[in-house]
Regions:
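Active-site beta3 strand of CheY-like receiver
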Residues: 42-53
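Conserved acidic segment of CheY-like receiver
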Residues: 1-8, 13-17
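Short hydrophobic/Thr-rich beta-strand motif most characteristic of the beta2 strand and flanking loop
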Residues: 21-29, 36
Length: 122
């Protein structure tokens, strides 16, 4: 699942995931992602989460996710343009698997990292 409010980036990430043989569900907002999780017959193997979303920040999304026993084990990869120590530590404390700074990694590298995690952890 990709939760990203920049539509062009959302499309690019989704296409790259599909090209890497990873099924992807695209969500433009945190609320859409949470609603989608309620309706999915099967939980996603991982979530790509942008920290800065229009409807809620990544921290609030993580709190909502971890409050549901059905969703609390879904691995979350936070992918953001900003990475203050407070943000990074807060997300990792809530169980994010990794906090990735967009500017420091190519899209292919981020997707390879997520794919490797999915393949080795499941």
């Amino acid at each position: 699942m990709v939760v990203e409010d920049e539509s062009l980036l959302l499309q690019a990430v989704t296409k790259k995931l599909i090209a890497s043989d990873i099924e992807a569900v695209s969500c433009l907002s945190a609320e859409q992602a949470l609603d989608y999780l309620k309706s999915l017959p099967e939980l996603p193997d991982a979530i790509w989460l942008d920290y800065h979303l229009k409807d809620m920040d990544g921290l609030m999304f993580m709190k909502n996710l971890k409050a549901n026993p059905l969703w609390e084990k879904i691995p979350v990869f936070v992918v953001s343009n900003s990475a203050s120590p407070d943000k990074v530590n807060g997300m990792l404390a809530l169980g994010a698997k990794k906090y990735i700074l967009k500017a420091e990694h190519r899209l292919d590298e981020i997707i390879a990292s997520i794919k490797e995690f999915i393949m080795t952890d499941n």
